[in-house]
Amino acid sequence: MAREFSRTDRVGQQIHKEIASILQNEFKNRDPRLGMVTVSAVEVSRDLAYTKIYVTFFENDEEVMDNYLSILEENKGYIRTLLANRMRMRAVPAIKFVRDGSLSEGIRISNLVDETLNKDKERARNAGRSLDEDEQED
């Protein structure tokens, strides 16, 4: 009978949970410069030696987000030590923090869609008809 999840998936889920907790609770006391950060995904290598931790920041300023990412990178040894204290593994994977751009990209696409819909409504209004009338004719 095949397992539902591989070992790397299970370790990745546990690392995701523990890192999120560490960043929200313990790390805030060590470095208060770090703003609101969320762990969005974790990728673990097949040999469990390396892990990429994708993080999202609730900021719009690129410079501030880069600063937050550098704070995490500077303290990844400390974070790895905290992770080792929480997990039962012979060797805890080396950590690399990566900024997850999916949230900002999703917001950008949503804004483009809204902008396009507003332009379509404006064109329909200028042509003397509403967009709702066009949809009812189809």
Swiss-Prot record:
<dbReference type="InterPro" id="IPR000238">
    <property type="entry name" value="RbfA"/>
</dbReference>
<dbReference type="InterPro" id="IPR020053">
    <property type="entry name" value="Ribosome-bd_factorA_CS"/>
</dbReference>
<dbReference type="Pfam" id="PF02033">
    <property type="entry name" value="RBFA"/>
</dbReference>
<dbReference type="GO" id="GO:0043024">
    <property type="term" value="F:ribosomal small subunit binding"/>
</dbReference>
<comment type="subunit">
    <text>Monomer. Binds 30S ribosomal subunits, but not 50S ribosomal subunits or 70S ribosomes.</text>
</comment>
<comment type="similarity">
    <text>Belongs to the RbfA family.</text>
</comment>
<protein>
    <recommendedName>
        <fullName>Ribosome-binding factor A</fullName>
    </recommendedName>
</protein>
<dbReference type="GO" id="GO:0005829">
    <property type="term" value="C:cytosol"/>
</dbReference>
<comment type="function">
    <text>One of several proteins that assist in the late maturation steps of the functional core of the 30S ribosomal subunit. Associates with free 30S ribosomal subunits (but not with 30S subunits that are part of 70S ribosomes or polysomes). Required for efficient processing of 16S rRNA. May interact with the 5'-terminal helix region of 16S rRNA.</text>
</comment>
<dbReference type="InterPro" id="IPR023799">
    <property type="entry name" value="RbfA_dom_sf"/>
</dbReference>
<keyword id="KW-0963">Cytoplasm</keyword>
<keyword id="KW-0690">Ribosome biogenesis</keyword>
<dbReference type="InterPro" id="IPR015946">
    <property type="entry name" value="KH_dom-like_a/b"/>
</dbReference>
<dbReference type="GO" id="GO:0030490">
    <property type="term" value="P:maturation of SSU-rRNA"/>
</dbReference>
